[in-house]
Amino acid sequence: MIQLTGDHELSVLKNEVEEIRKRTSTDFRLIAAKVDEWNYELSPWKAPAVFGNEDFGDGAVRTLEQILTLCTDKSRTYYIGGYSLAGLFSLWAAYQTDVFSGIAAASPSVWFPGFIEYMKEHEIKSETVYLSLGDREEKTRNSVMSQVGNCIRMGYGWLIEHGINCNLE
């Protein structure tokens, strides 16, 4: 499992590994891929800032190229996941390559301008997708981000309709 993460999440990775071990007997490795500039490195295309002053860049292609260098052993099964913008990146990555058997997108930023349309216009290359939406995400006052609930339900419906093994919690 490759998880895109930032400094703010490093302290919880040990607990995450322990929780995964409780739930599976499958041997696994968690690779934490640290991201420094989230709005640039994880964004598939440029978009204006939706909070603060920092616009979104288009560094996802380069980030994915770096991640794929970790996935060269064809005898292994690879999964990718992340939270928020890293969840969006993980979903986007599933449309770029068939290297990842599954995607874990926790509260993904599917409100990102144009992303749901992108999902509908391209073919996903992963077999399984896990999506989650927290209790507070769609209750924000930010008009763009408050659409996350509608967007994630649309994306989930689209994936199910097209035969993808998908869970939404």
Please report, for each region that a protein language model flagged, where it lies by residue.
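Gly/Ala-rich beta-loop-alpha elbow adjacent to hydrolase catalytic centers
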Residues: 81-86, 90
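A general structural motif
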Residues: 27, 75-77, 100, 124-128, ...
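A conserved short beta-strand
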Residues: 99-111
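Serine-hydrolase catalytic machinery in alpha/beta-hydrolase-like enzymes
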Residues: 1-70
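The conserved beta1-alpha1 loop
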Residues: 2-6, 107, 133
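Solvent-exposed loop/turn segments at secondary-structure junctions
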Residues: 6-10, 36-39, 87-88, 110-111, ...
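The feature captures the conserved acid-bearing segment of alpha/beta-hydrolase catalytic domains
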Residues: 109-169
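Active-site signature of alpha/beta-hydrolase-fold catalytic machinery across serine-
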Residues: 92-96
